[in-house]
Amino acid sequence: MPPINTDHLKDIENQLAASRTLEKYQFSSCSRTHIGLVRKKNEDALYIDEQQGLWLVADGMGGIKGGDLASAVVVDNLRSFKRLETLSESIRDIEARFRLANTACRVMFEKRVVGSTVAAILNFESIVVFLWAGDSRIYR
């Protein structure tokens, strides 16, 4: 997977710095996962840190043993996330954490195929960014 190209974000960051009068978004959130009607185990993991502006759902690969563990690894790698000085630095940090989770799963589970998709929202001042890996989606 090629790294995220954040060059275009520098223009947005410059505009944001020039105009600090933009209204900041405020969020109220709650969370819930459900096993659904097909699986015997809930393979979802979620994490919310409103203070850092991060919401994410990791969805373990259904039907493959260990999907619940893989989604937990994704969440564990994001728990210590702290927003950095710029939006592009924060996005690069999240991307690095996604990659670390992928590497951790490969090492932990060796020859077993396990995996998780992830969909995340990052609120950075007045900019909201959607990030994902795999086929999980974010709808408005």
Labelled PLM ranges:
Residues M1-R140:
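PP2C/PPM-type serine/threonine phosphatase catalytic domain
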